[in-house]
Amino acid sequence: MYCLSEAVIYVNGEFIPKSEAKISVFDEGITHGWAVYEGIRVYEGRILELDAHLNRLYASAKGAGIAIPIEQSEFRRAVLDTVVTNEYRNCHIAPWVGYGELGGEPSVVIRIVERSSRMGEHATSMVSSIRRAAPDSIPAQIKTNSRLDLMLAKIEASLAGVDYAIMLDNVGYVAEASLANIMIVKNGVTLTPYPINALEGVTRNLILRLLPMRGYEAFEDNITLHDLWTCDEAFVCGTGAEVRPIVKVDGRTIGDGETGPVTEKVIQLYTDYIITHGEEVDYSS
């Protein structure tokens, strides 16, 4: 039995109270950031895009040279069991796989925290002085623990008193926000950067699928600073970020400073998708 006053964490096949959960300090995931991870959300007992997240986790691990020691189907069951064990109906789940000690097995950890939704809350931003790592240096499609560029940008945003840092790529185009994808709207058309210097987000891809199904144009494109500063609407999206309108960039008001009509539609489509396509967690199992 577990005391549910604290979260129970999955660690290498066992469920352990958060205060007792541990892995080796010699794990390369800790000593050198040689680890991959995911972020998954549960809303009112519905888990969203679980298989898409696990597909990316296994692809990231392969790209990073980490051999996940369990089959994807077993990992899937472990994620669901983590939710059920904690009895959380609104939460954020973070599967993490570290390379392990040299010569040893990789570590598999599934963290979980209760989290309420911030969907639709206004956010402010700034263009960061930190550039996103070049794709020929650190491939953006590997969701790795070693994301120092993103964290430095996040710190910069925090010190500036804004919610998100918007990072440029090594050429000068908009890449992504700190720990979220970014989309802008110009003349009713939704644009998002190519997934070259930006993570190909699960939420991002979902929005790119949903908008055309409702008659809205949505494309990948190069986005300049001028595009960003002069767009009609902007929003960040991601599993953690959800969908939040960006109402200011570098102190400049985007549109009329309110949630734009396309962004409102995105929030509606995303919320409806959670209800219609979120996988119901069986808490009786």
Predicted regions and their residues:
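Short beta-strand micro-motifs enriched in acidic
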Residues: 98-100
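Helix-start/capping segments and mature chain N-termini
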Residues: 1-81, 85, 103-285
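Ordered, amphipathic secondary-structure segments that act as subunit-interaction surfaces
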Residues: 85-96
